């Protein structure tokens, strides 16, 4: 179960890390391409050399993720369970859902982590390992953010 004790302090650093990860992944093919979205995710890459500008664009990134929630869910549907698309999109989609569940929402109670159990049950056959890996990655980021939060 995730530790939400330092979630508020971790939020800022996690945003920075998530933005940095997205910028680093640009050009590798490991990113989401929204056909009907506003394109805000791509805006982050325009200011990769300026931390202030990156942080200013995090809001756009969050807005895009929120408004495209149905599309994110579609990414882990049967439509993407084959071939290259599965490898390209599934882990990223799982991470975005975890981001929505554990970071974007203001969760006060650790029992809210049960939502992850529902998600895992729904996609158990294919995505359990992917979601576990994404959850572990998010836990590690929160732990690192907690350790560094006093510097900010």
Tell me the role of every PLM-derived stretch.
Residues 1-86, 105-120, 128-152:
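N-terminal interaction/assembly modules
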Residues 99-105:
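Short amphipathic helical patch at the helix-1/turn junction of helix-turn-helix
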Residues 94-96:
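Glycine/proline-rich, positively charged
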Residues 89-92:
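Ser/Thr/Pro-rich, acidic low-complexity intrinsically disordered regulatory segments
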């Amino acid at each position: 179960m995730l530790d939400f004790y330092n979630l508020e302090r971790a939020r800022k650093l996690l945003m920075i890390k998530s933005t940095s990860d997205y910028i680093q992944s640009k050009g590798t093919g490991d990113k989401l391409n929204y056909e009907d979205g506003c394109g805000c995710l791509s805006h982050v890459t325009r200011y990769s050399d300026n931390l202030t500008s990156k942080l200013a664009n995090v809001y756009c990134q969050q807005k895009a993720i929120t408004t495209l929630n149905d599309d994110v869910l579609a990414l882990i549907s049967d439509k993407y369970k084959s071939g290259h698309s599965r490898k390209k999109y599934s882990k990223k989609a799982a991470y975005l859902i975890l981001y929505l569940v554990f970071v974007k929402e203001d969760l006060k109670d650790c029992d809210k982590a049960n939502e992850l159990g529902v998600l895992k049950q729904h996609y158990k056959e294919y995505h359990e390992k992917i979601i576990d890996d994404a959850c572990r990655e998010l836990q590690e980021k929160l732990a690192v953010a907690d350790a560094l939060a006093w510097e900010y």
